[in-house]
């Protein structure tokens, strides 16, 4: 659930966030990602709180988390999963925040974009590893990022492909290597959200 992004600007400012989340849940989503960054994504922690209280499935606090206070706020707002971005943290700091979150009973999605970052996630022992198809420096997207990194996956991890997934063909191309996909913009822009969810589900 995101109203805007740095690369696209405003996406869907008038969306009823709770209704949107409930539509996701009703059509087979297993987790709902909620953007809470106010500056770049026009999100808010209250959105996470509202959605978490109105759905049964887990919610992910998708934000640029760099300290323990943010993790506490995420948990208090109802998140069961948080995002930690390898590119934004030293390996030592990543481990500190990962351990802190798991000690609080939270799951952690550890986001990577290249092989070096994937290796960091593996060394960390992250259970859930995301591959972001968007370069956070240039904002360019390429599904080949997921295809390439999938060659280096290891057993014992749950892999999620993130960003730039719009069509049934996009999803099908990832199904053999990834346990799940994170779809944001495509659903926020869709006229028929339920139909779009079914199109990208596998």
Q: Can you annotate each of these PLM segments?
A:
Residues 3-14, 20-40, 122-150:
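Glycine/Thr-rich beta-alpha phosphate-binding loop at enzyme active sites
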Residues 1-18, 58-66, 107-112, 160-161, ...:
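Active-site mouth loops of central-metabolism enzymes
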Residues 45-56, 68, 89-96, 113-115, ...:
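Short loop-to-alpha-helix "cap/lid" segments that border enzyme active sites
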Residues 143-153, 189-202:
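C-terminal helical cap(s) of enzyme catalytic domains, especially alpha/beta-barrels
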Residues 66-78, 114-125, 161-183, 195-200:
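Catalytic cores of alpha/beta
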Residues 30, 73-93, 130-139, 177-197:
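Glycine-rich phosphate-binding active-site loops on the catalytic face of alpha/beta enzymes
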């Amino acid at each position: 659930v995101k109203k805007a992004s740095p690369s696209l600007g405003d996406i869907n400012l008038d969306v009823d966030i709770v209704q949107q989340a409930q539509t996701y849940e009703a059509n087979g989503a297993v987790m709902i990602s909620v953007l809470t960054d106010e500056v770049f994504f026009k999100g808010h922690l209250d959105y996470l709180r509202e959605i978490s209280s109105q759905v049964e499935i887990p919610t992910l606090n998708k934000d640029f988390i760099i300290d323990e206070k943010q993790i506490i706020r995420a948990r208090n707002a109802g998140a069961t999963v948080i995002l930690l971005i390898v590119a934004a943290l030293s390996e030592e700091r990543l481990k500190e925040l990962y351990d802190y979150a798991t000690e609080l009973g939270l799951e952690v999605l550890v986001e990577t974009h290249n092989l070096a970052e994937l290796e960091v996630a593996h060394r960390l022992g992250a259970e859930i590893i995301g591959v972001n198809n968007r370069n956070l420096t240039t904002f360019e997207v390429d599904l080949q990022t997921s295809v390439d990194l999938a060659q280096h996956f290891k057993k014992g991890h749950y892999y999620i492909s993130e960003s730039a997934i719009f069509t049934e063909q996009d999803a099908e191309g990832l199904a053999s290597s990834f346990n799940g996909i994170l779809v944001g913009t495509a659903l926020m822009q869709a006229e028929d959200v339920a139909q779009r969810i079914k199109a990208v589900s596998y």
